[in-house]
Design a protein with these regions (language model features):
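Hydrophobic transmembrane alpha-helices and their immediate loop junctions
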Residues: 1-220
Length: 220
């Protein structure tokens, strides 16, 4: 579902986002009443805005390198800026990847003084954006940190070998999240680990497709 456009970039909302939001608000309404449900809705809107600005950071930085963005889609657990093409230089990928967490860091810095002045919700907003920025810097695909890792490795190994090594490292993080999730019975960690494994497999298939017809095989 397309909501609006920013600088010619369509902003879309996946249907699962609305379903999950409705579930969370309904649960809070039944469990804790109208006030708690309203606060949950406000938090969800703040998270929505933060993720959108994060993805716009990627998209507008990519535009500086001549790379257009087809759309930005927001999902329950994050967003995706669909670039028209991959960056051709490691430096481009590095700056595009870092732009998203940098936006979250800037939002946290803006909100922090407001929190110190006692503005309601500012502290939570700052903490949320700080957590988003740090979480996205985890060096595992498809997180921004995974792309930063590949950009750094590409300077020494080339993009093909760098992608293989970055995906191998990403698998360790994915299995780590799953192991900790099982040990602590944390559904969130299990979902993150499963999502990372899915994304790693998709990137592996994408690279294998690009290598089709060459003498090199892509396997991890």
């Amino acid at each position: 579902m397309t909501l609006f456009s920013v600088r010619g970039i369509p902003i879309r909302l996946h249907s699962s986002f609305l379903v999950l939001a409705a579930v969370f608000v309904s649960v809070e309404l039944v469990r804790s009443g109208l006030t708690s449900a309203a606060m949950t809705l406000v938090f969800g809107l703040a998270l929505f805005g933060s993720v959108l600005l994060h993805e716009l950071g990627h998209a507008l930085t990519a535009r500086r390198f001549g790379i257009l963005t087809r759309s930005i889609t927001l999902y329950p657990f994050g967003g995706v800026a669909a670039l028209a093409r991959e960056p051709t230089r490691s430096s481009e990928e590095l700056w595009i990847a870092l732009a998203g967490p940098a936006v979250n860091g800037a939002l946290a810095l803006i909100a922090l003084p407001l929190a110190l002045l006692g503005v309601p919700g500012a502290g939570l907003f700052a903490a949320m954006n700080l957590a988003l920025g740090i979480f996205n810097l985890i060096p595992a695909f498809p997180m921004d940190g995974g792309r930063v890792l590949r950009a750094w490795l590409s300077r020494r190994k080339g993009r093909f070998q760098a992608t293989k090594q970055a995906l191998n490292i990403s698998k360790w993080f994915a299995w780590g999240f799953l192991a900790i999730g099982i040990g602590t019975t944390s559904l969130n960690l299990l979902l993150i680990g499963g999502f990372l494994l899915f994304a790693i497999n998709m990137e592996r298939r994408r690279m294998a497709f690009f290598m089709a017809g060459s003498k090199r095989r892509f396997s991890i």
